[in-house]
Amino acid sequence: MDDNKRPLYLPFAGPAILEAPLINKGSAFSEEERIFFNLEGLVPYAIETIEEQASRAYDQFRSFNNDLDKHIYLRNIQDTNETLFYRLVQNHISEMMPIIYTPTVGLACERFSKNYRRNRGLFISYPNKDRIDDILNNSTRQKVKIIVVTDGERILGLGDQGIGGMGIPIGKLSLYTSCGGISPAYTLPITLDVGTDNPQLLEDPMYMGWRHPRIGGEEYAEFIEAFMQAVHVRWPDTLIQFEDFAQKNAMPILERYKDRYCCFNDDIQGTAAVTVGSLLAACKAAGTELNKQRIAFLGAGSAGCGIAEAIVAQMVSEGISDEQARSQVCMVDRWGLLLDNMPNLLPFQQKLAQKCADICNWNNFSDNISLLDVVNNAKPTVLIGVSGAPGLFTEEIVRAMHSHCERPIIFPLSNPTSRVEATPKDILHWTSGQALVATGSPFEPVVVDGETYEIAQCNNSFIFPGIGLGVLASGARHVSDAMLMASSRALAECSPLAINGSGPLLPKLEDIHSVSKHIAFAVGKVAIEQGLSLPASDELLMQSIEDNFWKPEYRRYKRTSF
């Protein structure tokens, strides 16, 4: 039976119900509920439907003049009536997703302490390292199935935001629910407060976190270990998503725990999965295959290298050797093209460095080979930006790329909008509308020579909610590389441009529920095939996906005692 049709039995009444966001209905409590739960007089007389409430809330939302105020308003609804919040977002998802997440969430993180109103989630501070289990026990969510956790050190492209980074786990989990149908009762945002190296925060009298330089080394590793163990003991089947950890910690943490617990890093693996899915769709739209592409990256951090490794894996699955695939991927960072003779390459960069012998015949060879040098010599067909530095895809670079590639695939993925490597408008004008463009942040459609081009947002929200739903529905014990690859292929199968030859590269946000279910099925099926979950037929898996897909509808309440 659908949970939304079954009554929910509550052991308390009166103001306590109105203060519980997961069960509060506000003006939608029925006459019977108002009597039995001692609510008469605590809410206005009129009994409203959730759609009537959502209509009023939307009018109020539209009355705010800037996006940060809209964000604060929506968070206030979320903190008072979660069902109404998700109904409102569901009704206006294209308009509200940029408000509840990127790009607005970046500003919300920067002003977190100044705008703080009400607690959501858990803050686990290093001075309390010996009481982590007690802190987890304090959570108002006791059936936690998905955790998003950050330490606030690398928030979007904004750097160290300390506990202000909590805006990211809150926003991500809002998308797990609004896009992937995960019940908000099963979600828990967590910030690990290990100090901050941001001098502005340390000197800000309103900063609410642990006012101390960030810990590191063994202290940091032991704190993360204690946290992971405590979560596993309390909620052994919980999916843990790592979010916005600094490059020096992100990959080591993922490598340490991915085979021990059910976890993944969205910046590395989620970004890689959605990018590969978008590339597969773009290649199909251009009438080619991914293993035939030459790819240049601007940005060789953990996210960029994670994407590159996923691309290499997909190329190999399409029939070429690992060595050949790596030779077709060029990584450029602030020091230029990564080469195998560079002394300070990080471990995850080493396998992606080009061999010096392979580029000895390039023109303009120098110690620091620029992105323009790479474009002129390697002649890439795909250009991906994950640098966090705006404007680096210059007109000269894009035009040079277009001169040897009729339909260049260009993905400036850096967030927020102010950090994008080039705007879609510029890219499409420089290529006479021929480029296939996807961005990390939302952009308005672009008109070139009278033709309108919808800009695909290569946003992780197309991937991670479906992964989470697939893990929950299948009961997977780990998130494997094969499951992530399956999510990429499933996303590509939903591309309007690849399927119909017209429309955007990625689906519209209004179709996100069907996309998430499609991805969840692909992910769950691989988990079953790999023995990471109990055996189940396709029919049972689909039914489990539907059973786990929460809808923002009010339930009837009954009292358990008087």
Curated annotation (Swiss-Prot):
Its cofactor is Mg(2+); Mn(2+). Keywords: Metal-binding, NAD, Oxidoreductase. Divalent metal cations. Prefers magnesium or manganese. It is an enzyme of class 1 (oxidoreductase). SUPFAM superfamilies: Aminoacid dehydrogenase-like, N-terminal domain, NAD(P)-binding Rossmann-fold domains. GO terms for cellular component: cytosol. A divalent metal cation binds at residues 243-244, 267. GO terms for molecular function: malate dehydrogenase (decarboxylating) (NAD+) activity; metal ion binding; NAD binding; oxaloacetate decarboxylase activity. The keyword NAD applies. GO terms for biological process: malate metabolic process. InterPro entries: Aminoacid_DH-like_N_sf, Malic_enzyme_CS, Malic_N_dom, Malic_N_dom_sf, Malic_NAD-bd, Malic_OxRdtase, NAD(P)-bd_dom_sf, NAD_malic_enz_proteobac. The record marks 267 as: Important for activity. HAMAP family: NAD_malic_enz. Homotetramer. Belongs to the malic enzymes family. This is NAD-dependent malic enzyme. The gene is maeA.
